[in-house]
A protein has these predicted regions:
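Short, hydrophobic beta-strand segments
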Residues: 133-141
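Charged, heptad-repeat coiled-coil alpha-helices that serve as long linker/dimerization "arms"
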Residues: 2-133
Length: 141
């Protein structure tokens, strides 16, 4: 019984560890460090005394800052979920606590789901991807 529980947690740990390279790839694909630098530059612009004189520019800067912060926050939340899931697995495995298996499974699934969503969002982050689209379907061979 205890061996079975330990095996289940080991499988979960391996499943979670397989996601780590994809999470690291996502960090470089998003360009988290570059985005943080850009946020700092935009916040410096917003702190300038003449920032509000050009309303269009100020709104664009604030909107861009908000979008960039959302990207970084989403990535950081993914990393936090990864760490929390790993901690749950380690604690449950050390204590041979079968009651935490459902929670650990759920945590790993959440990390997988969030990772896939962020990968898709990263793929659809081009200049025009935030715009609406009109699709037309035509019958034919």
């Amino acid at each position: 019984m205890i061996e079975n529980v330990m095996l289940q947690y080991e499988e979960l740990r391996l499943r979670l560890e397989e996601l780590k390279p994809a999470i690291d790839d996502l960090k470089s694909a998003i360009g988290v460090e570059k985005i943080k630098q850009e946020i700092a530059q935009l916040e410096d612009q917003a702190a300038a005394p003449d920032f509000w004189e050009d309303m269009k520019n100020s709104q664009a800067v604030l909107q861009k800052t908000s979008q960039l912060k959302a990207k970084v926050t989403a990535y950081e939340q993914l990393c936090s979920k990864y760490d929390d899931a790993m901690t749950t697995i380690e604690i449950a495995d050390e204590e041979n606590d079968e009651s935490l298996y459902g929670e650990a499974c759920s945590a790993v699934s959440d990390v997988e789901k969030d990772l896939e969503e962020q990968k898709l969002t990263t793929l659809l982050s081009g200049e025009y991807d935030a715009k609406n689209a009109i699709l037309a379907f035509h019958a034919g061979a």
